[in-house]
UniProtKB/Swiss-Prot annotation:
The keyword Ribosomal protein applies. PROSITE patterns: RIBOSOMAL_S17. GO terms for biological process: translation. One of the primary rRNA binding proteins, it binds specifically to the 5'-end of 16S ribosomal RNA. NCBIfam families: PRK05610.1, uS17_bact. This is Small ribosomal subunit protein uS17. It comes from the Bacteria. Disulfide bonds: none annotated. The keyword Hydrolase does not apply. The lineage of its organism: Bacteria, Bacillati, Bacillota, Clostridia, Lachnospirales. The gene is rpsQ. GO terms for molecular function: rRNA binding; structural constituent of ribosome. GO terms for cellular component: cytosolic small ribosomal subunit. Keywords: Ribonucleoprotein, Ribosomal protein, RNA-binding, rRNA-binding.
């Protein structure tokens, strides 16, 4: 039996759910500036596959890396950590 490689997982906030079966997740990453050493917040967006259209804007979600599903989609929804109020 072939074992799969480890998949990257990210936690972020849903910023768009206007597409069918797709959500846009904003992930905040704290990186150290190479010269000055200050911790800087960097935000990047991922398109993720949401098969049942269950996410809404403001939800905190966990996404996992997967095979390419379209031109921009390389992540899929694993779980909804917290629903939006």
């Amino acid at each position: 039996m072939v074992e799969r490689n480890l998949r990257k997982t990210r936690t972020g906030k849903v910023v768009s759910d206007k597409m069918d079966k797709t959500i846009v997740v904003a992930v905040v990453d704290n990186v150290k500036h190479p010269l000055y050493g200050k911790i800087v917040k960097r935000t990047y967006k991922l398109k993720a596959h949401d098969e049942n259209n269950e996410c809404q804007i403001g939800d905190r979600v966990k996404v996992m890396e997967t095979r390419p599903l379209s031109k921009d989609k390389r992540w899929r929804l694993v779980e909804i950590i917290e629903k939006a109020k």
